[in-house]
């Protein structure tokens, strides 16, 4: 019986179209028969489900995408799968929404988000460009059914970051779009890259976001994944997942990758810093 060998990172870039039909059908049947297959929660028909992405609501329908490697329960070539729901109990399956089939994401469609603006829905995600695994930030439009107009909008700057560069988060303030992307600096410190743009699909580099505590820049591990930011009650709230973080408190940051939130003054977009953030272990 044919079976892919995923040891030593073999066969991690298999596409649905590459898999023998018999194999694909068999692993789906095996998954369906699993007595522990989730009843209420979203789960893939086979393979590996990674981050939920691009969450948005359109006319009372909630759209959920997630990263999917169909060939097996290991990390491999990521596609985006699409589901919808009205009540988060019953789900409608729409199949693969995004294949890794453009120049900008041919080696994987990774973490992203959706920004709803009136009738428009902008989607931002990390694409892996080639076999050298070079990351970039990509853009797509979502019309409620399909993701279209996919393209690269920001390139990784190899003079500033390592290959750890991913997870765009975008918001709009007044008439300008702002994007945060998590990264590892060349000095192996966790940093947030800030970009600005007049259009949702066009950005220029603005600088690194500094997290100032008592006038000193706070360091959080060697990489900051999945940044998320919003403002409320004259405060700026930043979420991120630091890699390589430690603490003198034996109860802090005991997950493999923890999540933290910081509450401080709103992000100063001219000086590019968040001042006096408090830091708490979130998970």
Task: Give names to the regions the model predicted.
Residues 2-62, 68:
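N-terminal regions that are enriched for targeting/export leaders
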Residues 46-49, 102-109, 159-165, 216-222:
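Short glycine-/Asp-/Thr-/Trp-enriched loop segments that recur within the blades
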Residues 272-283:
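Single conserved hydrophobic/aromatic residue that forms the stacking wall/gate
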Residues 51-72, 94-96, 110-130, 136-140, ...:
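Hydrophobic core segments of beta-strands in well-ordered, beta-rich domains
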Residues 178, 189, 203-244, 252-266, ...:
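Catalytic cores of carbohydrate-active enzymes
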């Amino acid at each position: 019986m044919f079976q892919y060998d995923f040891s030593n990172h073999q066969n991690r870039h298999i596409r649905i179209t590459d898999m023998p039909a018999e194999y694909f059908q068999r692993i789906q049947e095996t998954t369906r028969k699993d007595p522990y297959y989730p009843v209420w929660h979203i789960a893939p028909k086979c393979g590996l489900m990674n981050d939920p992405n691009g969450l948005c609501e359109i006319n009372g329908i909630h759209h959920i995408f997630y990263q999917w490697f169909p060939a097996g329960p290991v990390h491999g070539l990521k596609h985006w799968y699409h589901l919808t729901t009205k009540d988060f109990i019953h789900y409608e399956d729409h199949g693969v929404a995004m294949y890794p089939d453009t120049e900008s994401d041919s080696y994987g469609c990774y973490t992203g988000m959706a920004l709803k603006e009136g009738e428009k829905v902008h989607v931002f995600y990390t694409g892996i460009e080639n076999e050298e695994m070079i990351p970039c930030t990509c853009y797509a439009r979502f019309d409620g059914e399909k993701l279209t107009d996919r393209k690269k909008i920001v390139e990784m700057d190899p003079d500033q970051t390592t290959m750890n560069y991913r997870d765009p988060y975008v918001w709009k303030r007044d008439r300008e779009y702002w994007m945060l992307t998590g990264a590892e600096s060349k000095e192996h410190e966790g940093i947030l890259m800030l970009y600005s743009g007049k259009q949702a699909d066009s950005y220029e580099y603005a600088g690194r976001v500094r997290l100032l505590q008592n006038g000193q820049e706070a360091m959080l591990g060697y990489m900051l994944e999945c940044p998320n930011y919003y403002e409320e009650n004259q405060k700026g709230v930043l979420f991120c997942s630091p890699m390589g973080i430690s603490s003198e408190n034996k109860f802090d940051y005991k997950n493999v990758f923890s999540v933290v939130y910081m509450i401080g003054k709103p992000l100063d977009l001219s000086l590019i810093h968040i001042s006096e953030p408090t830091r708490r272990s979130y998970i």
